[in-house]
Structures are given as C-alpha cells and as structure tokens.
Amino acid sequence: MANLLIDDDAVTVSLSVIEKAEALHGDVRVPRTAVVRVRAVPDGMAEVHGLRMPGTGFPGVIMVGTWRDSEGVTFAVCHGRRPAVVLDLAGQAYDRLVVTVDNPEEAVASLP
C-alpha cells in the first residue's frame, strides 16, 4: 500500500516498487500550498472516474495510476473498496490525488 507522507512543505504519495510498475509512474510529490481541499471518503475507488492512461485497474480490486475525464486528471492508488484520502489540487500536473490509507481521518487532520 502507498504511504501518504506529509511534511511542512509537501505531500508525497510514496509508492512501493510493485505500485510503481502498476502505475508506470514514480512517487508523486506536490507542495502543500497546492492542496485546496482534503477529505476522507469511505470508498476511494468510487472517487476515480474516466479513462486509465497509464496504469492498472481491475474493478473492485485495484486502481493504480492516472485517470482522465472531463473534470481533470486524477492520480489514484486504491486497493479494494477501502477508505481513502482525496486531495484536490491547483496548479499541478494532477487535479486530484486519491489514496487508500489505514486512517484517512488522521491524514485529513494533518492537512489544511
């Protein structure tokens, strides 16, 4: 499972070696100032829409990589229908990050 690392300056989605292969992408790092909204959701997969390009997806099982739709570009790391953190971003390559985590409320509390 990916780790959501939060420090004073940035938020980093740290991927495992397998997730990097699934996503065809490395870790994603964005400045904290780019985060315009953050929320916890009960099912991260329900937040990811559009066409996968590139990445890996099996409905209800895994969504890792980039998804594009009319609302923008989402980078997702979702394993099963589990709780996740959704970060809406401004001025970045991705419009949203969706990451399944063990305790999404804790991550939300540590961000603006």
Regions of interest found by a model, annotated:
Residues M1-R32, V36-R39:
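Conserved beta-hairpin
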Residues A23-R32, V36-P112:
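Acidic, Ser/Thr- and proline-rich intrinsically disordered linker/docking segments
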